[in-house]
Amino acid sequence: MNKLILGIYLYRIFSRAYFYLPFLLIYFLIQDYSIIQLEILMASYGIAAFLFSLYKEKCFKICNLKDSNKLVVSEIFKIIGLLLLLYQNQYLILVVAQILLGLSYSMMAGVDTAIIKRNITNEKYVQNKSNSYMFLSLLISGIIGSYLYGINIKWPIIMTGIFSILTIIIIRCTLVENRELNLIGETKGKIKKFLPEEKFWILHYSFLRALILGFFIGFIPINIYNDLKLNNLQFISVLTCYTVMGFVSSRYLTKYLNYKFVSEICLVIFLIIYTYQSFIAVTISMIFLGISSGLNRPQTINKLSSSSNLRVMLNYAETLYFIFNIAFLLMGGYLYTIGTIQYLILFISLLIFIYLIIIFYFTRREQHENKN
């Protein structure tokens, strides 16, 4: 294993060690904010990430940053955001913290993927393996975070900050690229139009990811904490089930379930089971949500990796993801406020129906173009 591949693995493990993430909504919830205030906090992350994604290539060109330096700057923003999260009962400061964390995410989105594509021969293998390491990192950090949360609610945030510092050290020591490769990689791809097949996978990635992560991070913790009133052990069991299945599907099931609409089918099954609103039903439903989430990214990258347009497509997909995620959190938050979790599930079902109609259009268009 060469130094760069080791660096990619370590970077994706350490940078995705979000010890605090499963408890972020609960952390805000115990500060007595309303559901709308909570969803605005969550959406401010996406708004900041979305707005920066529109201009980040221009900003990076002006600053003349190498990809490894972009990742370092991203981690610095994350550390500052995490420090601000420690200020409890200061709503505006928490909003600023979420904005900085959103900027951090937007800066790093797609950069490590581009490094892999330009510098590593067996890129699909490294992508898939490192994706599974990301889920494993989320799983282990979530379990450790639950233990830390039981001791002190701020410790998971502090531990995430420590891992961000370690991530910067890893980047500096291992992610060394040829300067010319960075510049060449960014000038390609913007000329080509997206093919119908590429549009399908871009929409598949951005829309499903927005629904899955929006529901998992933005609503499930409130539902199982406030409505179902699960204890801490049950709470962790539900969240761990999702992460374990995300890891298994990303690492092992991708090669066997590499078909269109598998993620969509799993998401629909999740919604059906989740409506029963019991600990057992919710836990079982997390199996299907985890599979859907775990397949989403590696499957999309595998399908798009042969294109020289990969970086542009991933940036575009991330921008769409932010738009969908913001809209879903705000509209879903309103529905949850005026009704129950059933309102939200019906809303998601309607969104999936509209999404499938659009996907059907892209599929038919692709078939028509292939005939011609």
Feature locations, PLM:
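Symmetry-related core transmembrane helices of the 12-TM Major Facilitator Superfamily/SLC fold
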Residues: 155-172, 343-361
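Juxtamembrane intracellular "pre-TM" segments in multi-pass secondary transporters
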Residues: 1-2, 174-208
